[in-house]
């Protein structure tokens, strides 16, 4: 309702809608909310997870820093208000094809591996989200292994 009022007032004053505004039906908002959920399921978001979230959203969705922060803010609110994951996964299913959904699962694994470990809550979340997105167990596990391998390689390169 608040969005409708803002849009109405904007139209009356001749103002333009901000091009990076994220509506409730924007799959990027749904994807970001899932990433936020993944990063906070183990208690809180670490600094490395926050940096990874910003980098993932900025690069995958080709956003500038301000739009990325706006997406994080809007998605955090949406995730805090959500009672389940279906709100986000159903939007992603309606919007993205299989390669797009696989990309979301890959982003979530990257988010989960940002702190260097995967706990049982994160693993269960990935199983549930992948299932809701229609991603097979085989693909989910293959993406996990690929991201884990890339994470290990980048950690080894940084230590050298």
Model regions and ranges:
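Small-residue-enriched hydrophobic alpha-helices in membranes
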Residues: 1-37, 41, 46-160
